């Protein structure tokens, strides 16, 4: 193996390691949100991080304010009512010490008004209801060899241009890289 082969292999391995670390960061969001883990949330956002939930819901700036979302009484009630965040597999666009991640997020909850139904070998359930589906855009920065969230934007999938544009941007970055 030549030095250039080794350097190329090392560069490719670094990309794989970065993507795995980012997948883990993104995959940690649903369990942290669904358990109200403010400490965990604080550990993954930058001090001046931004949490943007679009034009119809409030957001937050700063790690303490973002972490406080998971401690709100309304969020705690949603958890007790069967809240679950279900994330789709993310597209990751790496650019040195920055990355943009684009994915979907479904917010589902136990359907307390649903009729109980039996599924063989899985018991009875009233089922779940999809409350909202959003486009989820994460802007990440590597700090001290660790990926951190600088900004997170959530826009509802409602057919309007802003969420479609977030999806196009995420897909476009991947398309350009693979061209």
Named regions from a protein language model:
Residues 21, 82-84, 131-132:
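Short, glycine/acidic-rich beta->alpha junctions
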Residues 162-179:
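Acidic/histidine-enriched, glycine/proline-rich intrinsically disordered or flexible terminal extensions
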Residues 38-111, 116:
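A solvent-exposed, acidic/Ser-Thr-rich amphipathic alpha-helical stretch
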Residues 113-125, 167:
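Short, surface-exposed loop/helix-turn segments at secondary-structure junctions
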Residues 76-80, 121-128:
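Short, P/G- and charge-enriched loop/turn segments at secondary-structure junctions
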Residues 1-31, 35, 43:
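Short, low-complexity N-terminal intrinsically disordered segments enriched in polar/charged residues
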Residues 25-28, 40, 44, 88, ...:
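Short, hydrophobic/aromatic alpha-helical segments in well-folded domains
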